[in-house]
Amino acid sequence: MKEVVIASAVXTAXG
């Protein structure tokens, strides 16, 4: 599920 990978990347970027 790419959505999970994207969500993880976004969370990291955001953080």
Curated annotation (Swiss-Prot):
It comes from the Bacteria. Its EC number is 2.3.1.9. GO terms for cellular component: cytoplasm. The keyword Phosphoprotein does not apply. Keywords: Acyltransferase, Cytoplasm, Transferase. One of its GO terms (molecular function) is acetyl-CoA C-acetyltransferase activity. Signal peptide: none annotated. It catalyses: 2 acetyl-CoA = acetoacetyl-CoA + CoA. It is found in: Cytoplasm. Belongs to the thiolase-like superfamily. Thiolase family. Homotetramer. Catalyzes the condensation of two molecules of acetyl-CoA to produce acetoacetyl-CoA. This is Acetyl-CoA acetyltransferase. It comes from Clostridium pasteurianum. The gene is thl.
